[in-house]
Amino acid sequence: MARARLVPLVLSVLGTVPLTLGTVPLTFARGTVPNAPTQLRLNDEGDSAAFRGWFVLLADAAFYQPVADVTDCAALIRYAVRESLRPHTPEWLRLARLPLEPGLPDVSQRPAGGDHMPLFRVSSDPEAPLAEFADAKTLIRYNARFVARDAGAARPGDLLYYRQPSQHEPDHLMIFIGPSRFDRGADDFVVYHTGPDEHGPGEMRKVRLGDLTRHPSPRWRPLAANQQFVGVFRLTLVP
C-alpha cells in the first residue's frame, strides 16, 4: 500500500474508487432516504454518540495505521462502521494497534455477529437481507441521507459525496473528521482513501476542509457551485 500522507493546500488530483440482527434495541426507521428500504438506526442518544466517536476515531486512525481491508473510499467506511459496532475488548484493542488509547464507551445496542456482520442495505426491497459489502453508490443510496449542499453543515462522521461522470468509477466519498485526536492543528479535517488507479493501489489521505475548498481542480471542491459535489450525507445508522 502506498504510504499515507497529510495533504497540503496544493493537492494532487484525487484518485478514483471502484466504488439476523440479534439485539432487539436496534430499531428501524422508514423514509429517511428517497426510494430506500427500512434503515438500521441507533436511536439511543448515548449509543449514537458512542458510534460516532468510534467511527471518526477509526477512520482517522486508518490514515496513521494502514488497514489491510481498506482499499478504497467505500472500504474505509465499511471498516469504520463494522469495527465501531464491535465490543472493544482487550484482544480487539491489541489487534487494532490504535496509535492512542480510545477512551470511548462501546455501543451497547449493537448487532449480533462475530467476524461476519451484514450491516448494509443493498436493495430497495425491504425484505432483502443486509450485506457485508456496499460500494460507494450503494452506501449513499441506501445507507445514508442527504444533509446539505453546504459542506459547513457537516458533523464529525458525515460523508462528503462526489460524483464524477467522466470517470470509470464516478462515485467517491470522504469522511469529515472535524477535530482530530491525532493532530490538534485544526478542527476541520477530512480523511479518505483514493482507491486504486493505473499507478498503484492508492493511499489514505488527510486534508483540511478549508484547503479542499481551494483544490487546484475545481471539480473536487466541496462547494455548492460545483456540480460534481453532490453534498453532505449522514449515515442512517445515527439520527
Predicted regions and their residues:
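...with weaker cross-activation on analogous glycine-rich loops/strands in unrelated enzymes
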Residues: 100-199
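Surface-exposed flexible segments
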Residues: 6, 173-180, 207-215
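N-terminal capping segments
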Residues: 28-131
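Long alpha-helical scaffolds
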Residues: 5-6, 59
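Signal peptide processing junction and immediate N-terminal pro/mature segment
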Residues: 20-30
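Low-complexity, Gly/Ser/Thr/Pro-rich intrinsically disordered linker/tail segments
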Residues: 187-239
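Bacterial N-terminal signal peptides
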Residues: 8-22
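N-terminal secretory signal peptides that target proteins for export/translocation
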Residues: 1-2
